[in-house]
Design a protein with these regions (language model features):
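Carbohydrate-active catalytic/glycan-binding domains of CAZyme proteins
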Residues: 1-306
Length: 306
């Protein structure tokens, strides 16, 4: 079997330096951008927000907020909370890392990360991660479906950072397991069948179909290896290629991001990618910086590999 190999680089530049900031939203931090094309035209951007002390929504804890845009460039903050976290006894006592998609029934769906304090196999308290589902007619007002997905093949049944797509009338979810990306499929978007590890190393992925090719952006270590007890803060962005959105080439491309001054963006500031193709056919990837103070977007400066 082929092993993952870095075969080259692909160049991106910062498009919008500040899509929004944590202080504009009155939050302590904002991370995990997820974007969707609206049926009515334009785009919505969803974010995980950790409430600040002077929160505009009088909220606390970790919730999901949104912004709206007609062009993908100028963004307006939408008041209120899209997904409010549950109680300390709920699977989503923190509600974060949104992944938004349009269902076959033309409703909007969200697969977000629910975190709660649970007890691990050793009997110790530990934060647990599950993928939780919600539905909306308009993308603004959401109802929780009281459904969640966990992966018993992972330690603590860990599953987070979901990214969901429709491929050939089937829902495909990519999510983060134990520092890898796992694929599951569903015919109704509610009952999921775990398929296999799609990417053997990495976390926080986003997939997009662009110019008839499927691309996945994944955060990975530069060496494509995690030594024991390794941290992820120096991980960088890689680009993976697929012709069907299911089978991924083991030839990986390192994404080089330069800011408007031509300086390379630091690894720590490249986190939680969320990709979208705008109506003019151009690609954008949204990211948050270290500490979740800023959301910014990037665009390719060269043709992507096929």
């Amino acid at each position: 079997k082929a092993v993952p190999t870095i075969v080259g680089t692909v160049n991106f530049q910062v498009d919008i330096q500040q899509v929004t900031t944590s202080s504009q939203l009155g939050q302590a931090s904002i991370i995990g951008p997820s974007l969707i094309d609206l049926k009515s035209g334009g785009y919505r951007l969803y974010l995980q927000a950790r409430a600040g002390k002077n929160d505009k929504n009088n909220a606390e804890g970790v919730n999901i907020l949104s912004l709206i845009s007609s062009d993908g460039i100028e963004w307006n903050i939408e008041p209120g909370i899209r997904i409010k976290h549950g109680t300390q006894f709920d699977v989503d006592s923190e509600a974060g890392e949104p992944g938004v998609y349009l269902g076959m029934d033309e409703k909007y769906y969200m697969a977000y990360t629910g975190r709660f304090m649970g007890v691990n196999k050793r009997g110790l308290k530990q934060t647990m991660h599950r993928i939780v589902f919600a539905v909306s007619d308009d993308g603004l007002t959401w109802s929780k479906l009281n459904k969640h997905y966990s992966d018993p093949e992972n330690i603590n049944d860990f599953a987070s950072s979901a990214d969901v797509h429709l491929i050939n009338r089937q829902y495909v979810i990519y999510y983060t397991g134990q520092r890898n990306i796992i694929r599951a499929t569903s015919h109704d978007g509610l009952q999921w069948t775990r398929k296999k590890i799609a990417v053997s190393i990495g976390h926080d992925s986003t997939m997009v179909k662009y110019e008839d090719t499927y691309y996945m952006f994944v955060i990975m270590p530069k060496t494509l290896l995690y030594p024991r007890n390794a941290t992820t803060e120096n991980d960088i962005l890689f680009l993976l290629v697929s012709d069907n959105g299911i089978d991924w080439s083991e030839n990986y491309y390192q994404v080089i991001i330069k800011d408007s001054d031509g300086n390379e963006v630091k690894a720590q500031d490249i986190q939680d990618p969320g990709a979208i193709v705008l109506s003019d056919g151009s690609l954008r990837v949204f990211l948050n910086n270290h500490g979740g103070k800023i959301i910014y977007s990037i665009k390719p400066t060269e043709k992507l590999p096929k």
